[in-house]
Amino acid sequence: MFGYVDSRAENNTFVPASQVQRPSMFGWGRSRSRSVFISTFCPRGKTVFFGRRGYVSDCMDEWIGLMGGSVTYAEEAGAGEDWLRRLAPRLDFILVDESAAEDIRQLVEHCLFLRRALPEVPLLLLSPSVKGDDFGTERMAICDVTLRTPLSQAAFVRALRIARSNNRRYVGSLAAPQPSALRA
């Protein structure tokens, strides 16, 4: 069991890690008990996670909670297209863990479905099988950012910022005239 020994207590009491109040980078700039990061990353307060519960989902739960948001697990909610569309106005971003699919083809199809259903919601792909984080726009058709797992909280925060920017580009590309339409 992970934890800390509280040296301030009379008998150096052991405190489990889950009960320790740790300082957080999200604590700086608090205004009326709300972090500045809440309005930046989780203004609507909801994230959907596609994937199996485990270490990655636990980290996402904790980090998003620190930002003032909450995570809904799609498998537990029975996520279909109608459910996603109803939830869309409250969504800040979508997380897709590679564990959500049986193979890469199914993963890509799932991401394409999410992109078509909710193009305006930033989509982050989490995968242990990629060589490194990818913040470019080459995979724009399926996601805004790809993160290699396991990942750090700092990488996650950076990815959220970049995912929003990449998503604006993606939505803009949908509105732009297509090259084939220009020739006609």
Cite the ranges covered by each PLM segment.
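Non-catalytic signal-transmission and effector/linker regions of two-component phosphorelay proteins
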Residues: 1-65, 85, 89-90, 115-116, ...
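Short hydrophobic/Thr-rich beta-strand motif most characteristic of the beta2 strand and flanking loop
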Residues: 27, 68-78, 83
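Conserved sequence signature across two-component system core domains
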Residues: 50-51, 74, 94
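Conserved phosphotransfer microenvironments
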Residues: 57, 81, 87-118, 130-134
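Short acidic-hydrophobic, aromatic-tinged amphipathic segments that line or gate anion-handling sites
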Residues: 74-75, 146-149
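Two-component signal transduction core modules
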Residues: 94, 123, 146-147
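Hydrophobic/aromatic residues positioned on beta-strands within the core alpha/beta folds
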Residues: 126-127
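As written
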Residues: 137-147
